[in-house]
Structures are given as C-alpha cells and as structure tokens.
C-alpha cells in the first residue's frame, strides 16, 4: 500500500499538487473536509456523529477523523494521498498505527515562504458558481473577472487579505512544526516557492525514480 502525506501552509499549492500527483501515482485523495461531508451525506453512524459536531460548532475530534481515514484506507487498497491530514501529532500517531511496516509511506512538506504565500493568496479569485479557483498572476481567467467554465463573476475570499494570510501562516508554522519533527524519518522537504510543475517534477523524481 502506498501512502503519501502532503503537508504545507495555505497557498503552498497542496490542492493542485494533490490532483496531479494522485493521477500520476494512481492513488485516491483524502481531504478531511470532503470526507466529513461524504460521511454526513451517507448518514452512517460516523456521519451522524460528525453532523452533530458540525451543527453544534464543535471541532471534530481526532478519533473521528482517524476513523474516517481508516475507512478510506480500507476502501482504497491501491493507495491514498492525504491532503492536509494529519493536523496534530495525535492524528499522526494514529495514521502511523494504520500503516504497516511493509507499506510505502512518504511525507512531503511544501516549504513555502511567507512572502510567496501572501503573493499567491492575495491574487487568488474564486468562482462562487462552480468553485473553480484562479490566480490573477499565474492562472488568470480568459476574460478578466469572469469564470471560464460558467461565466460567473469571480470573487475574492474575505480571508484572502494580507493581514489574515500572514496570521494564518504563522499559526500554521506553530501547529505544523511538531508534525515535521514527528515525521523526520519519512519527510521529503520540497521548495514550495517553485512553480507547480517544478514541484511535481521534484516529487515524481523522488517517489518514482527512473
């Protein structure tokens, strides 16, 4: 079983990389938010618990997140790429317990600077119609301010301001530092300031050497 963990601050390119890398490796992608919504929609026992937590405004506990990860791993024997999970050392320890010594575990940390993150996210625009994400510097729409897919006017997220982005970046570094240390043995640190193509090329070279 191949298991890949993607860590990195908001704006480091995890989402885009997860899509490209999962297609290249032939593995499924686990995104915590998506898994929570799927559990709620399925109305499973786990989903009912998640729904109660979400509706009450409570953080979903580590045990529940790990149970979702375990279900996802069992459903995808071809391998799994975890995007933004684990978020705590407790979740990391739980994930390690789910992965056997024979499994192929890789942890990739996209190490991007505060300046790079701020530049990327202040340039980000989102389509409220179909959810497509653009970057006015690196991936602009064909028609200024309008989604290529559905012609909806693009918006800027309220939290994509420089002050909020810099604060989120510092919080992420504080929360992630223990994870980077925890996974020191498996960690592949990649320069997240590079373009998405170069980052993908570097990771593919490490995971799939010729």
Question: For each of these PLM feature ranges, what is it?
Answer:
Residues 1-210:
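Glycine-rich phosphate-binding loop of ATP-dependent small-molecule kinases
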């Amino acid at each position: 079983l191949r298991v890949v963990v993607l860590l990195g601050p908001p704006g480091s390119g995890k989402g885009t990389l997860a899509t490209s890398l999962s297609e290249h490796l032939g593995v499924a992608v686990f995104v915590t938010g998506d898994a929570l919504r799927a559990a709620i929609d399925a109305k499973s026992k786990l989903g009912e618990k998640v729904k109660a937590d979400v509706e009450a405004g409570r953080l979903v506990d580590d045990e529940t997140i790990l149970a979702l990860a375990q279900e996802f791993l069992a459903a995808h024997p071809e391998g799994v790429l975890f995007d933004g999970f684990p978020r705590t050392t407790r979740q990391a320890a739980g994930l390690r317990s789910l992965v056997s010594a024979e499994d192929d575990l890789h942890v990739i940390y996209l190490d991007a600077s505060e300046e790079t993150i701020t530049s990327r996210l202040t340039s980000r625009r989102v389509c409220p119609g179909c959810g497509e994400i653009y970057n006015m510097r690196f991936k602009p729409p064909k028609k200024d301010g309008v989604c290529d897919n559905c012609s909806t006017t693009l918006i800027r997220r309220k939290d994509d301001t420089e002050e909020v982005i810099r604060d989120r970046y510092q919080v992420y570094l504080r929360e992630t530092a223990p994870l980077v240390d925890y996974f020191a043995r498996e960690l592949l640190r990649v320069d997240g300031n590079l373009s998405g193509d170069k980052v993908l090329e570097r990771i593919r070279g490490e995971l799939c050497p010729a």
